[in-house]
């Protein structure tokens, strides 16, 4: 864990809860991930990723429990967004309720995700990609363009075409290859 966080009188975990873009489980991108990767920095990220994405759904809450047991997490304040990236819900969660409440909030986040109205397409044309949309440039939860076998959902598409890169990505075209 980050030295400054570990030495703090208390830690309040603030984050978004949303579907992950590479795996599925009861804890994806949210409080547990913020405790393990956010507070754990590089070593936390290495620890939770060490067994590969196929074990992420198991490793993330297990590692988060170690963080809770060995630090002073006071509570968490996650938010859930709507389909327009606007805050739909903010909730304070006592530490002892994090592992119970986060999966429930993830279900709300899934139900709030935007979607493409058709389920299958031959070609998906994406106007803009960028790191601000997803680490892979486009959110596979919507586009179905998964870079891993451990994620699922979104459109079933045969070919995808990207027209432009968002300026705020500063040339980072991760997801193009």
Question: What positions do the PLM features span?
Answer:
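Anaerobic metallocofactor- and corrinoid-dependent redox/one-carbon enzyme cores
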Residues: 1-177
